């Protein structure tokens, strides 16, 4: 069985005709969520085929074949949408179509990386990536058993180097209690 990559999470229903909001977990929603796309469900279950897709007030709304009312849409709330890893392509593909590679990583590529500060101090290892509407956070498990939540933005995480097995964190004052 091929490895699955999560590309989205189904949110609340929108309207009465089966549309749902999507929490996007891919940098290429214009390629992943097109009409006719077949998306798996994390852990198995019947695949979902996109039969309609559009943006409304900054949110992606999808309609799936066979999901024709609010009740059916509500039953899908929280489902993680997946693709097979072999369908994903390289995370360094030209994701936005401008002819240049885009720097992005799959969650699975980040979990387990060693996290160090710009001064070389070990913070721990990446244990999870938390996706939220406000932005992504890296959960870093410390050697003392504690956990740091670090906003995954270039200003704070300037270096991500999976081949070297590390990320570099440049925390602003007050972000981490390092004393």
Swiss-Prot record:
<dbReference type="GO" id="GO:0005840">
    <property type="term" value="C:ribosome"/>
</dbReference>
<dbReference type="InterPro" id="IPR011961">
    <property type="entry name" value="RimM"/>
</dbReference>
<protein>
    <recommendedName>
        <fullName>Ribosome maturation factor RimM</fullName>
    </recommendedName>
</protein>
<keyword id="KW-0963">Cytoplasm</keyword>
<dbReference type="InterPro" id="IPR009000">
    <property type="entry name" value="Transl_B-barrel_sf"/>
</dbReference>
<dbReference type="Pfam" id="PF01782">
    <property type="entry name" value="RimM"/>
</dbReference>
<dbReference type="Pfam" id="PF24986">
    <property type="entry name" value="PRC_RimM"/>
</dbReference>
<keyword id="KW-0698">rRNA processing</keyword>
<dbReference type="GO" id="GO:0042274">
    <property type="term" value="P:ribosomal small subunit biogenesis"/>
</dbReference>
<comment type="similarity">
    <text>Belongs to the RimM family.</text>
</comment>
<keyword id="KW-0143">Chaperone</keyword>
<dbReference type="InterPro" id="IPR036976">
    <property type="entry name" value="RimM_N_sf"/>
</dbReference>
<dbReference type="GO" id="GO:0005737">
    <property type="term" value="C:cytoplasm"/>
</dbReference>
<comment type="function">
    <text>An accessory protein needed during the final step in the assembly of 30S ribosomal subunit, possibly for assembly of the head region. Essential for efficient processing of 16S rRNA. May be needed both before and after RbfA during the maturation of 16S rRNA. It has affinity for free ribosomal 30S subunits but not for 70S ribosomes.</text>
</comment>
<dbReference type="InterPro" id="IPR002676">
    <property type="entry name" value="RimM_N"/>
</dbReference>
<dbReference type="GO" id="GO:0043022">
    <property type="term" value="F:ribosome binding"/>
</dbReference>
<dbReference type="GO" id="GO:0006364">
    <property type="term" value="P:rRNA processing"/>
</dbReference>
<comment type="subunit">
    <text>Binds ribosomal protein uS19.</text>
</comment>
<dbReference type="InterPro" id="IPR011033">
    <property type="entry name" value="PRC_barrel-like_sf"/>
</dbReference>
<keyword id="KW-0690">Ribosome biogenesis</keyword>
<feature type="domain" description="PRC barrel">
    <location>
        <begin position="102"/>
        <end position="175"/>
    </location>
</feature>
<dbReference type="InterPro" id="IPR056792">
    <property type="entry name" value="PRC_RimM"/>
</dbReference>
């Amino acid at each position: 069985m091929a490895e699955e990559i999560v590309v989205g999470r189904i949110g609340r229903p929108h309207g009465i005709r089966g549309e749902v909001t999507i929490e996007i977990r891919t940098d290429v929603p214009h390629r992943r969520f097109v009409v006719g796309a077949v998306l798996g469900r994390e852990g198995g279950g019947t695949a979902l085929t996109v039969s309609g897709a559009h943006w409304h007030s900054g949110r992606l709304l999808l309609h799936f074949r066979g999901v024709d009312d609010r009740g059916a849409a509500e039953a899908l709330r929280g489902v993680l949408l997946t693709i097979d890893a072999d369908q994903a392509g390289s995370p360094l593909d030209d994701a936005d179509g401008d002819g240049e590679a885009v720097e992005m990583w799959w969650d699975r590529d980040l979990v387990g990386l060693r996290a160090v500060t710009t001064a070389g101090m070990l913070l721990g290892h990446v244990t999870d990536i938390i996706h939220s509407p406000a932005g992504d956070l890296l959960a870093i498990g410390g050697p003392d058993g504690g956990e740091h939540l670090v906003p995954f933005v270039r200003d704070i995480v300037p270096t991500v180097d999976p081949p070297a097995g590390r990320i570099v964190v440049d925390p602003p004052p007050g972000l981490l209690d390092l004393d």
